[in-house]
Amino acid sequence: MRILVNGGGPAGMAFAMFAARSGRGDEITVRDWTGPGDTYGFGVILPPAAVEVFRDAEPDLADELNSHITAWDRLSVHRHGRTASIPAPRLGAMDRRTLLKVLRRRCAERGVRFEHGAVDPALGDHDLVVAADGARSVTRRHRAAAFGTTTREIGPAYIWLGADRALEHLRFLVAETPDGPAVAHAYPYSPDRSTFLVEADGAPPPAVLAEWFAGPLGGARLLENRSRWSRFQEIHNRTWSAGNVVLIGDAAHTAHYSIGSGTRLALDDARALADALCAQPRLADALKGYEDARRPIVEHTQRIGRLSATWFTRLPDVPMERLLDDLATRGGQISWRDLATEGSGAVPVRG
């Protein structure tokens, strides 16, 4: 089977590695518009279950990824000059560039080919085309009617930034501004870096944001990397495959960033698709099996993400202890069990 993977992010790289290891693909090519090391973003959240996706197939890879992860088991809120924290399910993050470097090396060791340049929406003569080219997928957009793609904006305006300091753990920082509260979602991903995502009205420049959050930043600088203000696009597709083209990761679905599930969903998709191709000799059956396995989990995660986004849009001004409780359950709409399950790739069983 000749396989083309459009997109060299976590979903595309992980799928190529799994497919090459299984021997299902005689020739696997990853095509990406960026070159090696030329990536965007800062740290990505990897709950323990995301790393365990690799454990049985690549135990040394799981160990290598764990060695790069900065972990925490608390979350805190800072508002009105006060900080309070509570224990939280164990989570961690790592540099997105490091994750891709590790996965790319594993792909190369298994004979995966790499091409760089604009993603070509044409199918060519490949037996399978895997659309792993992100939320703005060119591959999907050229077949939007076949996939039944719909999008909707959820949550407030936001911008992805970094900080040149490792914060202690997952922190939610609230700054009072003339346009209302601005909220930073911040977490460490290396010994000297943190992701620093800010939600605010009016699209203020990073220099203004640095002033608003000067206290919690403690002298750290805010960093930009293709950073721009936008609204989150929740993506749905009626079907995840059309002919020999299949969607994975953000090309197939997105869940709001406030629950930190995007990379885990991408890695789980990659493993599930590779497993389905091994289990079913007919391509159509394999693609159906992949979607049947993943869609319930994805739709559950998207629902949790919508509840979370709505809560942040209506951030309550309540005493600190109440705010912590509200944050942990997004105003009583979800539970710690929901959030812990977000890291396990499973849909909770409701009693």
Curated annotation (Swiss-Prot):
Its EC number is 1.14.13.223. Its cofactor is FAD. Keywords: Antibiotic biosynthesis, FAD, Flavoprotein, Monooxygenase, NAD, Oxidoreductase. GO terms for biological process: antibiotic biosynthetic process. InterPro entries: FAD-bd, FAD/NAD-bd_sf, PheA/TfdB_FAD_monoxygenase. It is an enzyme of class 1 (oxidoreductase). It catalyses: 3-hydroxy-4-methylanthranilyl-[aryl-carrier protein] + NADH + O2 + H(+) = 3,5-dihydroxy-4-methylanthranilyl-[aryl-carrier protein] + NAD(+) + H2O. Pathway: Antibiotic biosynthesis. Pfam families: FAD_binding_3, Lycopene_cycl. GO terms for molecular function: FAD binding; monooxygenase activity; NAD+ binding. Belongs to the aromatic-ring hydroxylase family. Involved in the biosynthesis of the antitumor antibiotic sibiromycin. Hydroxylates the C5 position of the peptidyl carrier protein (PCP)-bound 4-methyl-3-hydroxyanthranilic acid (4-MHA or 3H4MAA), leading to the formation of the fully substituted anthranilate moiety found in sibiromycin. This is 3-hydroxy-4-methyl-anthranilyl-[aryl-carrier protein] 5-monooxygenase. It comes from Streptosporangium sibiricum.
